[in-house]
Amino acid sequence: YSIGYMHHDPDRPRFFAYLSLFTFAMLALVTADNLVQMFFGWEGVGLASYLLIGFWYKKPSANAAAMKAFIVNRVGDFGFALGIFGIFVLFGSVNFSDIFANAATYIPAEGTTGQTVLNFLGYELDKQGAVTAIALLLFMGACGKSAQFLLHTWLPDAMEGPTPVSALIHAATM
């Protein structure tokens, strides 16, 4: 569909380069076996989305939409990055296999008192509080990328890009 739609656009090589970058970043995101690699794919998807939304950069509305998408996604990415850092502090690893293998040790036993395992924004968190805080930070990242609750304002503006971009971004965020 993109080939026919972009056939008469003189900048189609740039469009397909951005589209290839998006595809590469999405593949890096979904095939990652650790959180750092996943984060690089995550950021690549955000960068490629910014480039694709602002493809027609001579239109002020396309530039504004691209900047809005970029900034709102950075808010979610900040939460995601803090969540990854929290996981590293708790588990000492960012590999999914290590995290999943040790996750059961962070389920609080009945009747145990909370030992501080994480200091976050001046709060001393026990195991249960730390896992909850990390889950909320990761959720914040997911909300930013998938245009959910309060971080959704960029998605309607993404229609400023070419139609194939709008379809791709709306499908990728759902």
Where are these regions (language model features)?
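...captures the hydrophobic TM-helix bundle architecture rather than a specific catalytic motif
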Residues: 1-174
